[in-house]
Amino acid sequence: MAERAVVYADELRVKGAEAREPISKLPFGVLVCVVEQDEAWSALQTPEGSRVWVRSGDLLPLALRPKPDAEGIAYTLGLLRCLVGIPYLWGGRSSFGYDCSGLSQAFYNFMDVGIPRDADQQCRAGILVEGEPEAGDLLFFGKAGVGRADARYHNVTHVAISLGGADFIHASGGSVGITINSLDPHSSVYNAYLQENLLAVRRFR
């Protein structure tokens, strides 16, 4: 019987059935259907009915998928840190590149929490946080001078994932890609622009 699993690695190399040569990649957090498995390799069923092979250690059984509680969020954030350095790609959600909302969506999808695709849509969902952000909360940024309570709409242009406290991880545009920054002016990774343009914090569980 086929079993479902979730991609655990930052990228998963798909190999063909013959020489198991690399033929494609699967991104972090995607669900797959495992039809055969040993300690080293797992066979996945494709929509076309053929089989491809991936390393078993790069898959997490669906039953072990973390929950969006404090422990699961900390675990998933640890995995997300492995994505630091991946390029920014508008519309992307794979090891070829992520955009800001693609990263936040992949983060929550890994814990089986569905959230909208775009940053402004994500800011309309979840629970508005009035106090300090907790790890896993989403930070929304946009035009300066707009109050946090009004940030559920078109002013949102960027989203990041709180690491707890002032630090956050996000997919930054340009040549930066996925990186860690801070809202703390005393931090070596302080981002003044984003600190000045923080509009809202929202929580998803």
Question: Whereabouts are the PLM-identified features?
Answer:
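SH3/SH3-like (including bacterial SH3b) beta-barrel domains
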Residues: L12-F28
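Loop/turn positions that initiate beta-strands
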Residues: L26-V32, G136
